Design a protein with these regions (language model features):
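Conserved alpha/beta catalytic core and glycan-binding cleft of carbohydrate-active enzymes
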Residues: 80, 268, 272-448
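Glycan-recognition and catalytic regions of carbohydrate-active enzymes
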Residues: 340-357, 412-413, 418-427, 452-526
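Core domains of carbohydrate- and sulfate-ester-processing enzymes
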Residues: 62-95, 182, 201-216, 324-353, ...
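The feature marks proteins involved in alpha-glucan
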Residues: 1-11, 15, 36-108, 113-118, ...
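Substrate-binding/active-site clefts of carbohydrate-active enzymes
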Residues: 98-101, 106, 110-250, 255-283, ...
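Short, well-ordered beta-strand segments enriched in hydrophobic/aromatic residues
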Residues: 16-18, 525-531
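Short proline/glycine-enriched turn/loop motifs at strand-loop junctions of beta-rich domains
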Residues: 19-25, 533-535, 543-544
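C-terminal beta-strand-rich structural cap/linker in extracellular carbohydrate-active enzymes
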Residues: 20, 54-56, 557-571
Length: 571
């Protein structure tokens, strides 16, 4: 039903298709002219404007009065409240062979803070570092246009428009091409569960939102009510745009548990089908906190973010047990997370005060993306502390070893590879009214911790600047550790096979030891021992013919593993 919607450049001008059942008239204002569009079935308006070309700006005029950007605008160079710009993306991207799912090693970056310049072009200049690190995929936090110049991107309002401050659509296309030229796949974080409050005009066009459900961030998207065919189409066409128009190799779907859909065919199933058909080899990864195997087994998604390993690691190295960390206190939770993926597979979870999760039996380890840091787990803290700050560099290294040697797909968060200690804070760029509300809300969120007066102001430009990586630190022993770990993952079949069924993990709470064993049908074997305590402990197995490959701290001649350290042996 959405065929022909959006702006399209044609010979001699441009055509426009807009779903706007709420308006009685709709026109395009461009080049000093106002051209009325014609209403068709189901509230779709269509028309053409002669003489327009790529680079021309335009606005939609609703009911002869309100001037608004196009819901399918590909560029908002003057901000989310200003006119839209016609864009020619050029020829289709050159083919790129996306790595096999099990070979993915993700590097999550935020374009605005990854480099001092905060642009796609500047980020492209750092790709050599990522290649040397050993990752295989760059996961870019949301780039859909959002208010102002600074933000995480999760309050985007123009889903098709690439954020101007980063370099707009041309900059993003160059970045994707540069990644492919360096042999790196590109995954894009997209947000379909809500739109931000600032610059969100979709509700003036049609029933894009529903009052049947809400999300923690605002109105839920109308995926199953009257008019939802067009709302779903906005999402599905957008997903296809990224993988075909820009050459993105995969999508990371934000918080899919907040996609409220009672349709016969769930939006996730339809989206996976669309992406896989539009670009064979393209992948879809979902963030969900519901522990539902059906995301893969029924809906056809390729993988899921797995927070349980993060939570178990975080508790083990920091001792924090409040909030959603309650339930991960036992060191056995870490062993279970390393073996199973999810700790909660149907048992009681104190944080929720109910049973939680389902056994992911039959799913390979390549269906889970794991980390010890990501934008959420760092940035949603009041002060955005990195794990190296909270736990110290030694235990941070232990967590890194367990993530890299797990049977799952590892993800690093920007700067983690050199032990970055600069925070990743929550930052925004709103007008005075909304900025005040966000500031007060942020302080109220952490008032129980007596931090209310100290929480950084999200709208202060200094908060954003403090979150930028310190590239002067991009080196040293932490980087060498990660390079060694990722090299082992590539070279040792037992570490790279993602075989949960050939993985065992044991915890010794008394000695604060966790032992992880991996094997492969080829005969390859790997053993990882992590000492999460402060005292040296004797290595709990006969190393035999295994060769020591990595040790985060020296192992004594008598075979004792130092406190707060980990080591890896392989055949």
């Amino acid at each position: 039903v959405t065929e022909g919607l959006g702006p399209r450049l044609v010979e001699g001008g441009a055509t426009f298709g807009v779903w706007a059942p709420k308006v009685t008239s709709l026109a395009v204002r461009a080049g000093g002219r106002v051209v009325e569009l014609e209403r068709h079935e189901r509230g779709v308006w269509r028309g053409a404007v002669e003489g327009l070309a790529a680079g021309d700006d335009y606005l939609l005029v609703l009911d002869g009065q309100r001037e608004r950007p196009d819901p399918r605008s590909r560029f908002q160079p003057h901000g989310v409240h200003g006119p839209s710009r016609l864009v020619d993306l050029g020829p289709p991207p050159a083919p790129f062979a996306t790595p096999a799912l099990r070979d993915l090693i993700f590097y999550e970056l935020h374009c605005g803070t990854f480099t001092p310049e905060g642009t796609f072009d500047a980020a492209a200049g750092r790709l050599g570092h990522l290649v040397d690190l050993g990752v295989t995929a760059v996961e870019v936090m949301p780039v859909a246009a959002f208010p102002g110049s600074r933000g995480w991107g999760y309050d985007g309002v123009a889903l098709y428009a690439v954020h101007a401050a980063y370099g707009g659509p041309d900059g993003f296309r160059r970045f994707v091409d540069a990644c492919h030229g360096a042999g790196l796949a590109v995954f894009l974080d997209v947000v379909y569960n809500h739109l931000g409050p600032d610059g969100n005009y979709l509700g003036e066009f049609g029933p894009y939102f529903t009052d049947r459900a809400t999300t923690p961030w605002g109105d839920a998207v109308n995926l199953d009510g009257p008019g939802s065919d067009f709302v779903r189409g906005l999402i599905l066409d957008n997903a296809e745009q990224w993988v075909t128009g820009y050459g993105v190799d995969g999508l990371r779907l934000d918080a899919v548990h907040e996609l409220h859909d009672r349709s016969s065919v769930h939006i996730l199933e339809e989206l996976a089908e669309r992406v896989h058909a539009a670009r064979p080899g393209a992948l879809v990864v979902a963030e969900s906190d519901l522990h539902q195997p059906l995301l893969v087994t029924a809906y056809g998604l390729d993988a899921m973010w797995d927070d349980d390993l993060h939570h178990a690691l975080h508790v083990a190295v920091t001792g924090e047990t409040s909030g959603y960390y309650d339930g991960f206190q036992d060191l056995g939770a870490l062993a279970k997370a390393l073996e199973t993926g999810w700790v909660f597979i149907g048992q009681y979870y104190p944080f929720l005060d109910r049973r939680h999760g389902r056994d992911p039996a039959g799913l390979g380890g390549e269906r889970f993306v794991v980390c010890s840091q990501n934008h959420d787990q760092v940035g949603n803290r009041a002060f955005g502390e990195r794990l190296a700050t909270l736990a110290g560099p030694d235990l941070d290294a232990v967590a890194s070893v367990l993530v890299a040697c797990s049977p799952f797909l590892p993800l690093l968060f920007q700067g983690q590879e050199w032990g970055e200690t600069r925070p990743f804070l929550f930052f925004t760029d709103h007008g005075p009214g909304l900025a005040s509300a966000v500031r007060q809300g942020r302080r109220a969120e952490f008032a129980a911790f007596d931090w209310a007066d100290e929480v950084p102001d999200p709208n202060d430009p200094a908060t954003f600047e403090r979150s930028k990586l310190d590239w002067d630190r991009a080196g040293g022993p932490v980087l060498e550790l990660w390079q060694a770990l990722l090299r082992l993952r590539r070279e040792v079949p037992a570490l790279g096979n993602c075989r949960r069924d050939l993985t065992t993990a044991r915890a010794d709470p008394e000695r604060r030891l966790v032992t992880l064993e991996r094997s492969d049908p080829s005969g390859s074997r790997a053993v990882v021992v992590a000492n999460l305590g402060q005292r040296s402990q004797h290595i709990p197995f006969d190393t035999g013919k295994l060769r020591l490959r990595v040790a985060t701290r020296p192992i004594s001649p008598s075979g004792d593993l130092s406190g707060a350290s980990a080591a890896v042996w392989t055949t």
